[in-house]
């Protein structure tokens, strides 16, 4: 480019006009964002959100205390203690997840033979203290009860790919 052309473009503010033309081009197009708290995008059935412990339809918890999720967790965020029951089966007495350590990899969900521990659809959970991110068995079961319908639908939608 010649010096005269560069000088002419600088005097006419050519770049400024190009920027405004680009702005006007997108100004009249439909918006590309959503109004988040009021509108939400659909989540994938494979979305990994807040953890939950599921129950059987009769109300009994699914976890059989095999501790596979604890063993497979790369962040060592899961702690399980169990005791044998009168009928010879094991059940958990303590099931804790330290959400500050969790990396949401989904290995715990994949390792569970009875689909007891799952990562649900909830991604909107915040706390004021770190202690609230230490989930115990009661909190995990409450999450499972709260999100059971959505969790079951997600697992059913994902079943052909498992």
Curated annotation (Swiss-Prot):
[4Fe-4S] cluster 2 binds at residues 73, 102, 105, 108. Gene3D superfamilies: 3.30.70.3270. Pfam families: Fer4_7 (PF12838). This is NADH-quinone oxidoreductase subunit I. It is a peripheral membrane protein. NDH-1 shuttles electrons from NADH, via FMN and iron-sulfur (Fe-S) centers, to quinones in the respiratory chain. The immediate electron acceptor for the enzyme in this species is believed to be ubiquinone. Couples the redox reaction to proton translocation (for every two electrons transferred, four hydrogen ions are translocated across the cytoplasmic membrane), and thus conserves the redox energy in a proton gradient. The lineage of its organism: Bacteria, Pseudomonadati, Pseudomonadota, Alphaproteobacteria, Sphingomonadales. Its EC number is 7.1.1.-. [4Fe-4S] cluster 1 binds at residues 63, 66, 69, 112. NDH-1 is composed of 14 different subunits. Subunits NuoA, H, J, K, L, M, N constitute the membrane sector of the complex. GO terms for biological process: aerobic respiration. HAMAP family: NDH1_NuoI. Its cofactor is [4Fe-4S] cluster. GO terms for molecular function: 4 iron, 4 sulfur cluster binding; iron ion binding; NADH:ubiquinone reductase (non-electrogenic) activity; quinone binding. GO terms for cellular component: plasma membrane. InterPro entries: 4Fe4S_Fe-S-bd, 4Fe4S_Fe_S_CS, NADH_quinone_OxRdtase_chainI.
């Amino acid at each position: 480019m010649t010096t005269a052309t560069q000088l002419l473009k600088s005097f006419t503010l050519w770049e400024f006009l190009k920027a405004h033309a680009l702005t006007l081009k997108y100004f009249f197009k439909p918006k590309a964002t959503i109004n988040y708290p009021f509108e939400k995008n659909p989540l994938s059935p494979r979305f990994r959100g807040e953890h939950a412990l599921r129950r059987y339809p009769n109300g009994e918890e699914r976890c059989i205390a095999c501790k596979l999720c604890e063993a497979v967790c790369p962040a060592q965020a899961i702690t399980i203690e169990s005791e044998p029951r009168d009928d010879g089966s094991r059940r958990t007495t303590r099931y804790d997840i330290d959400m500050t350590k969790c990396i949401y990899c989904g290995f715990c969900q994949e390792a569970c033979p009875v689909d007891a521990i799952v990562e649900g659809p909830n991604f909107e959970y915040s706390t004021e203290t770190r202690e609230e991110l230490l989930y115990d068995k009661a909190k995990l079961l409450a999450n499972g009860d709260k999100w059971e319908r959505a969790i079951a639908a997600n697992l059913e939608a994902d079943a052909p790919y498992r």
